[in-house]
A protein has these predicted regions:
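Envelope-exposed proteins and targeting segments
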Residues: 149, 212, 417-421, 426, ...
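Short, conserved micro-motifs composed of acidic
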Residues: 33, 92, 99, 103-419, ...
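Alpha-helical protein-protein interaction scaffolds
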Residues: 24-131
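Periplasmic peptidoglycan-binding/tethering modules of Gram-negative envelope proteins
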Residues: 400-452, 513-515, 528-540
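Extracytoplasmic/secreted proteins, especially bacterial periplasmic and envelope-associated proteins
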Residues: 22, 26, 38, 56, ...
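Bacterial Sec-dependent N-terminal signal peptides
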Residues: 1-24
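Periplasmic OmpA-like peptidoglycan-binding domain that tethers envelope proteins to the cell wall
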Residues: 340, 345, 456-540
Length: 540
């Protein structure tokens, strides 16, 4: 009887193991086909998730913008298999953590990946440049199809735009996200930045393949755009994938002519996201062609007067990283804007700009960039407004924005003494009279949207240098605690005690001054930074 039970148990284990292998095989097939939505569901059904299952499940969530789920799966992956996990999973895990709001953990994995210290708070502070800070106010555009993905926006003439969308339900379903393939649309722009009269582009342009990211010449007679190649090509892993090429079409008798693939496109790699310089003499694009810095790089190529092209040039390491640089746009003042997840940023794709020789990339800050993908940025510099795409709401959506330039202004507030004493002799507690003054200061800090608040506190000359230094620091901390208790963020406040080293009068000795004169040095000074909009004077 015991042998019978053992046989039954072994049979059940074998059936279970066979079922597990079958589930993994099914999920792996979907993953290889880049059907990530279905792959995630299939991998979730696997009871005993090994390292490869966790890697692929995490990636399936990551590539479909389910960052909270991705972070949870990658966390389990690293808890179980940290010593054997390839570096690229650190990179994706760190981005998932950033999107999930776990910045300290994200810093840890970014630091491990890049092999250098990463401090997100320091990066945020570095974005504030007193000479060149722009604040963006973004608004999601209303759409008549909330389930579609909309991005790849571009200017089309004076009052029109073009964008890519999955809203055409007559197109084939794309396994990656289970939405229709992309088509190009056009629409009118209102003064408020709203889009209306949205219509499909010509059937000469749109096909059952993906079309996106159009770029138009200034006269509106030439368009460059992305289209997925019909032919699939085996990548280094032996997986058949469809790469992307740039096509060009000319307006003939009021209609778009048959598109032609530009000559440096290929079946073996992608060439995508065209953008024209203001004078139309240079075409910018993204590509993962061999010889770049890694993944997708940005390139430029001369467009000759006869319509032929020069030799593509990589924009170099100031712009390009080992990760993705995509969606270039060149404004009327020849500033290059682009999206990247390889430079340190606020999460996933961020928008950057570069001027001059493209030797440096500058992040546009967190009034524009989110912890998710922000990309396809376009702007009319003179009007200080434009558009971008972002999946910060969970789906690719279009946003309009207005931009204002600010300077950082440092304001100093010193608590008035009059006949009052800031701190009693040898004390650091806040008196009721002083609380009333601090309440007024708090109102100023809140109304000014103050940042980088510093409290510097002082002592009189009575007592040892060491004791007075400690006493002044306690006074600074006491002042800070009062501000924090009344709604000022502790992270915005720093404190420093100067002891008796910075008197406001000549009372530098322990004797020789009146009590009122000594009292003037028992004080706190509060300084803070605030942003002041740059008002441009109208030229006459």
């Amino acid at each position: 009887m015991k042998n019978i039970y053992k046989t039954i148990l072994l049979t059940l284990i074998s059936i279970s193991a066979f079922g597990q292998k079958s589930e993994i095989k099914k999920a792996d097939k979907l993953f290889v086909q880049r059907a990530y939505v279905d792959a995630a569901d299939a991998y979730e059904d696997v009871a005993d998730k090994n390292q490869e299952v966790l890697q692929n499940l995490g990636d399936s969530y990551f590539y479909t913008n389910q960052m909270q789920n991705a972070a949870e799966v990658y966390k389990l992956l690293f808890l179980r298999h940290e010593q054997n996990v390839a570096p690229e999973y650190e990179f994706r895990f760190a981005h998932s953590l950033r999107a999930a709001g776990q910045d300290d953990e994200a810093d840890k994995y970014f630091a491990s990946y890049y092999d250098r210290e990463i401090a997100f708070e320091d990066f945020q502070a570095s974005i504030v440049d007193s000479s060149n800070l722009f604040i963006y106010e973004t608004t999601m555009l209303a759409t008549d199809n909330s389930t579609s993905s909309d991005f790849g926006i571009s200017y089309f003439g004076e009052d029109q735009i073009s964008f890519a969308s999955t809203r055409n339900t007559a197109r084939p379903i794309y396994p990656w996200n289970k939405k229709p393939t992309l088509d190009l649309y056009s629409g009118n722009i209102s003064e408020e930045g709203e889009i209306s009269n949205v219509v499909l582009f010509s059937d000469v342009i749109n096909t059952d393949e993906h079309e996106s990211s159009a770029a138009f010449s200034q006269d509106g007679q030439t368009v460059y755009f992305d289209r997925t190649n019909e032919k699939r090509f085996k990548d280094t892993s032996g997986i058949r994938v469809a790469h992307i090429s740039i096509f060009r079409s000319q307006m003939v008798d009021g209609a778009w002519g048959e598109p032609e693939k530009i000559p440096f496109s290929s079946e073996e790699y992608s060439v995508e996201h065209p953008a024209l310089s203001p004078d139309g003499s240079t075409l910018f694009f993204a590509s993962d062609m061999p010889g770049g810095e890694g993944s997708f790089d940005l390139y430029k190529v001369a467009v000759n007067e006869d319509g032929t092209f020069g030799t593509p040039e990589n924009l170099g390491p100031g712009i390009n990283t080992e990760h993705r640089e995509q969606f270039p746009f060149v404004s009327e003042n020849n500033t290059l804007y682009f999206a990247s997840d390889g430079h340190l940023g606020f999460g996933n794709l961020d928008i950057y700009k570069s001027e001059g020789d493209y030797s440096e990339a500058e992040n546009l800050g967190n009034s524009l960039n989110s912890p998710y993908d922000d990309f396809a940025f376009i702007i009319k510099e003179g009007e200080k407004k434009g558009f971008l795409a972002s999946n910060r709401s969970g789906n690719d959506n279009l946003y309009s924005f207005t931009r204002a330039q600010y300077i950082k202004k440092t304001v100093e507030i010193e608590i008035p003494h009059e006949d009052r004493i800031y701190f009693a002799f040898d004390k650091s507690n806040i008196t009721p009279e002083y609380q009333q003054v601090l309440d007024q200061i708090i109102d100023i800090l809140k109304s000014s949207e103050a940042t980088e608040i510093q409290i510097a506190s002082h002592a009189d000359a009575r007592g040892t240098d060491e004791y007075n230094m400690d006493l002044s620091q306690r006074r600074a901390e006491s002042t800070k605690n009062y501000l924090v208790e009344h709604g000022i963020a502790a992270s915005d406040i720093s404190t420093i005690g100067y002891g008796e080293s910075r008197p406001v009068n000549d009372c530098t000795d322990a004797t020789g001054c009146t009590e009122a004169e000594y009292a003037q040095n028992r004080r706190s000074v509060i300084t803070f930074s605030t942003m002041e909009e740059v008002v441009e004077e109208e030229t006459k």
